[in-house]
Swiss-Prot record:
NCBIfam families: PRK11650.1 (NF008653). It is a peripheral membrane protein. Homodimer. The complex is composed of two ATP-binding proteins (MalK), two transmembrane proteins (MalG and MalF) and a solute-binding protein (MalE). It comes from the Archaea. This is Trehalose/maltose import ATP-binding protein MalK. It holds the Pfam family ABC_tran. Its EC number is 7.5.2.1. Induction: Induced by maltose and trehalose. Contains an N-terminal ATPase domain and a C-terminal regulatory domain. The lineage of its organism: Archaea, Methanobacteriati, Methanobacteriota, Thermococci, Thermococcales. Keywords: ATP-binding, Cell membrane, Magnesium, Membrane, Metal-binding, Nucleotide-binding, Sugar transport, Translocase, Transport. It comes from Thermococcus litoralis (strain ATCC 51850 / DSM 5473 / JCM 8560 / NS-C).
Length: 372
């Protein structure tokens, strides 16, 4: 097995910079997620690691081997990188059986027939495909086809798996099941895996670490807890989480409040101290709080002083059964709360809303970078 390292990698297509100053280290055996919206550069990054695209600048290492460095004229072709890719499309050969589809990469490498048979059957057992080995792809469900595509990658025993949105063609229920299966499989095999997705749920539930990208730039790398609880900037904070984080413009006042114009909230002493030391008192900031950190006061699980209780008008209630997504307004300020199912708020009525000030985030108004 091997880790993967990118050092100051750029990719430019004409006048478009698809990837900019990308430096990332994926540890041996790690499940790394490349997460971001469409067009952020995540698939281009994966293709450069695979050798399907050549970087415009920078170095790429697989294990200790330098596989790409334009300045030194080094570019190792995909077949010599000991990687296996799984794509969004299953790319199975329709005229071949499941057995032959899985065996195909080994036949190309002229592996002895007996070894091919042994490895194919081992992989089929691992993926629950043993009973399907004689079937053709058209006779399989979407989930079964995806497992065959995975089997074809696994059977090669590569150093690194590269996966480009492999679950996006599956229906929602099957995606949930395949997420768990993929994570379990990666743990069993212990193979370094780099997985591209735009789906934050896939990223949060599957990855050891998540690399969040936007507009070709790496925004933050961290564990699911780190990128959720301590986002580096407003992009990461808003991209991860559903419903997304509330962002409100506010001014830090000299008496220790954040003032939204329509209402004020009392900062905790250590929060006000940090903002004071960094020169933010009297300045505009972006106040962030996740919907689950707002409570219907009747069911609040946190003890809150009166300064952090706000009376708001309920505009819309989305009943999800286990929770209620409540759209709220105070004058011209709007925000969203995720209330417990016991809350019976109705549209058009007023409700007292509790802000859990221990969970707030403050961002620089100009740069969007997190202050805390």
């Amino acid at each position: 097995m091997a880790g993967v390292r990118l050092v100051d990698v750029w990719k430019v297509f004409g006048e478009v910079t698809a990837v900019r100053e990308m430096s990332l280290e994926v540890k041996d055996g790690e499940f790394m997620i490349l997460l971001g919206p469409s067009g952020c550069g995540k698939t281009t990054t994966l293709r450069m690691i695979a050798g399907l695209e050549e970087p415009s600048r920078g170095q790429i290492y697989i294990g200790d081997k330098l596989v790409a460095d334009p300045e030194k004229g080094i570019f190792v072709p995909p077949k010599d990188r000991d990687i296996a890719m799984v794509f969004q499309s299953y790319a199975l050969y329709p005229h071949m059986t499941v057995y032959d589809n899985i065996a195909f990469p080994l036949k190309l490498r002229k592996v002895p027939r007996q070894e091919i048979d042994q490895r194919v059957r081992e992989v089929a057992e691992l993926l629950g495909l043993t009973e399907l080995l004689n079937r053709k792809p058209r006779e399989l469900s979407g989930g079964q086809r995806q497992r065959v595509a995975l089997g074809r990658a696994i059977v090669r025993k590569p150093q690194v798996f590269l996966m480009d949105e492999p679950l996006s063609n599956l229906d929602a229920k099957l995606r949930v099941r395949m997420r768990a299966e993929l994570k379990k499989l990666q743990r069993q095999l212990g193979v370094t895996t780099i997985y591209v997705t735009h789906d934050q749920v896939e990223a949060m539930t599957m990855g050891d670490r998540i690399a969040v990208m936007n507009r070709g730039v790496l925004q933050q790398v961290g564990s699911p807890d780190e990128v959720y609880d301590k986002p580096a900037n407003t992009f990461v904070a808003g991209f991860i989480g559903s419903p997304p984080m509330n962002f409100l413009d506010a001014i830090v006042t000299e008496d220790g409040f954040v003032d939204f114009g329509e209402f004020r909230l009392k900062l905790l002493p250590d929060q006000f101290e940090v903002l004071g030391e960094l020169g933010y008192v009297g300045r505009e900031v972006i106040f962030g709080i996740r919907p689950e950190d707002l409570y219907d006061a009747m069911f609040a699980q946190v003890r809150v002083p009166g300064e952090n209780l706000v009376r708001a008008v309920v505009e819309i209630v989305e009943n999800l059964g286990s929770e209620r997504i409540v759209h709220l307004r105070v004058g011209g300020v709007t925000f969203v709360g995720s209330f417990r199912s016991e809350s019976r708020v109705r549209e058009g009525v007023e409700v007292d809303v509790v802000f859990d000030m221990k969970k707030i985030h403050i961002f620089d108004k100009t740069t969007g970078k997190a202050i805390f």
